[in-house]
């Protein structure tokens, strides 16, 4: 399945709504001000674009998945903000050098295969006195653990593959964006009425899990259930756990 189509399967907006607080946190840490030109790279359904636009910034939201941009447009309209939604590749941004005061990405840039190229593009379009602010799940956190477990049962990745959660390590970000980077760790709380119900919801809604289920069948479901039971902090039959992410501001 083509990656841009994969993200359009299921109901990603329902998943994105659960991590909306991370977009708000990222926008706050980016110190966006009215009138600034802001680019949200791999904007998804607009979790960071819309909060930035609410601050009276001039926001461009870019993503390679048309289905996600359709949802983002609806979200922006419902929120009564103006965002320029553009289909495009994080590894080949369709903008001139030094076009933006802020370049942000909330869990989107991390999925671009070539980390160096993605970082170079973000730096290229950011103004010399601007800032790049990104959020990524940490590899040692509970979402990072999900990526590890599913990766362990999946076919070997192509040569040179870089795990998305490398963006959640300080050393890797410094290698990509330079030494002048500030880091903060935050958490998103994930909740469900039950482990089984949450697993069903995610496997039906989250594009990467849908694709993995098609490829791995019951092994994916069994592995995901085991993971959820291991990370669950609730003792009342429900599901509750905290996913750690790293905010990097350069």
Q: Where are the predicted features?
A:
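Conserved class I S-adenosyl-L-methionine
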Residues: 1-36, 47, 51, 71, ...
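Class I SAM-dependent methyltransferase SAM/SAH-binding core
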Residues: 37-41, 45-92, 117
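Conserved Class I S-adenosyl-L-methionine
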Residues: 18-19, 45-47, 166-176, 180-250
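Short conserved AdoMet
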Residues: 31-33, 54, 113, 127, ...
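A short acidic, Gly/Pro-enriched loop at the edge of an enzyme's catalytic core
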Residues: 91-102
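Conserved catalytic/acceptor-binding region of the Class I
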Residues: 116-117, 123, 127-193, 209-213
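A short SAM/SAH-binding and catalytic strip from SAM-dependent methyltransferases
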Residues: 102-115
């Amino acid at each position: 399945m083509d990656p841009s189509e994969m993200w359009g399967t299921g109901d990603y907006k329902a998943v994105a709504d659960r991590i909306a607080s991370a977009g708000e946190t990222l926008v706050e840490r980016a110190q966006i001000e009215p009138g600034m030109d802001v680019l949200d790279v791999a904007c998804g359904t607009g979790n960071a674009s819309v909060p930035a636009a609410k601050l009276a910034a001039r926001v461009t939201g870019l993503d390679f998945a048309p289905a996600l941009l359709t949802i983002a447009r609806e979200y922006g309209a419902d929120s009564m903000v103006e965002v320029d939604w553009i289909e495009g590749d994080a590894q080949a941004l369709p903008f001139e050098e030094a076009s933006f005061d802020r370049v942000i990405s909330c869990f989107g840039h991390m999925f671009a295969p070539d980390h160096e190229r993605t970082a170079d593009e973000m730096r290229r379009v950011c103004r010399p006195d601007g800032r790049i602010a990104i959020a990524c799940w940490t590899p040692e956190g509970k979402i990072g653990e999900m990526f590890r477990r599913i990766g362990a049962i999946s076919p070997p990745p192509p040569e040179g593959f870089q795990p998305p959660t490398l963006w959640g390590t300080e050393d890797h970000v410094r290698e990509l964006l330079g030494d002048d980077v500030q880091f903060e760790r935050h958490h998103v709380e994930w909740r469900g009425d039950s482990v089984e119900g949450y697993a069903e919801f995610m496997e039906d809604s989250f594009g990467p899990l849908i694709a993995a289920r098609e490829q791995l069948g019951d092994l994916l479901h069994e592995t995901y259930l085991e993971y959820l039971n291991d990370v669950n902090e609730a003792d009342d039959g429900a599901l509750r756990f905290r996913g750690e992410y790293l905010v990097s501001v350069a």
